[in-house]
UniProtKB/Swiss-Prot annotation:
<dbReference type="Pfam" id="PF07153">
    <property type="entry name" value="Marek_SORF3"/>
</dbReference>
<dbReference type="InterPro" id="IPR009823">
    <property type="entry name" value="Herpes_SORF3"/>
</dbReference>
<protein>
    <recommendedName>
        <fullName>Uncharacterized 40.6 kDa protein</fullName>
    </recommendedName>
</protein>
Amino acid sequence: MSRVNATMFDDMDIPRGRFGKPPRKITNVNFWHVVVDEFTEGIVQCMEARERLGLLCTISTNEGSITSFDIHKDMWCQMVIWSAYRFFAIMDKMFSIETITNFTETDVTETGQWRIFYRTWDVRDALKMKQVGPFLPALFSFHLENWTTMLSIGINKGYDRHNTRNMFMTIQSARNVLSGAIEVARYAVVLALPVCEYRTPLGLPDDSIGNAIKTCCTQMQANRLTETGISKDSGHKINDSSEEELYYRTIHDLIKPNREHCISCNIENSMDIDPTIHHRSSNVITLQGTSTYPFGRRPMSRMDVGGLMYQHPYICRNLHLRPPRSRLMNSKILQTFRQSFNRSNPHAYPI
């Protein structure tokens, strides 16, 4: 939500407050790239949670805590349905259902109309939602609302909507991100409906999107009353069919290129630097270090410190923005760096 905070008062002549500072200024040039980053990070988190939910083994349905009605879980799942409705509505406003049908194959459209389909493993995993508590619906609702807010800001604040449509229509990675986000909204609705006892939220509009959600609810309720070939998990056996495995692999391949270039992805980066500094030339030195993160290593660019050029062998492509150190701390680090360099290389140029 820091991106939303950064764009909230961009076009208003209001002085900055005393409590915080936006991490970066959002402009017409970088806004939509930031939106793609937000989509990518949210899809990664939601799909990770969705896959782990599928790996969770169900327990006996005789347990009262699982089958009983919980007002808190019902409230969160109702919020998920509302969040998905608002996300579908902003997508329809921005691209139209015909455009979405043309550039992506999803389970939310049919012959130019909104229609939400459900899969066999969605029905199987819907009961598991009651085992994980309200945290998973809260995760789905947060990301759906975040995406809706970012798209609404882009439309209402005049961020070059025409070029945005061209970007999402011509760039394959951007289309893949939209496909993944639509899929997250689809299965969020399908997983939330059984927890709500197949009740849609009060006041849900009777437009094409609202009717699609209600139709999906009716079909799932009818499927519950009929015998189907859906198998449930038993013991420690996981019902991992080839179709379900292909489903997860397909979505993983959709977002993998964007995840590698995403600025805001949660990348685990551990840096171990050897204090020994090796002399390479008269004015270039190298720090020995290793960097660990999911998608490999990248060479580090050279930097100028105190009149000298140094480089680190490896660097994560997009590091998190860290709070700047104080000037006193920087001066102490630079002093220690110079002393260590002079001890290891007595023939170095004076700093």
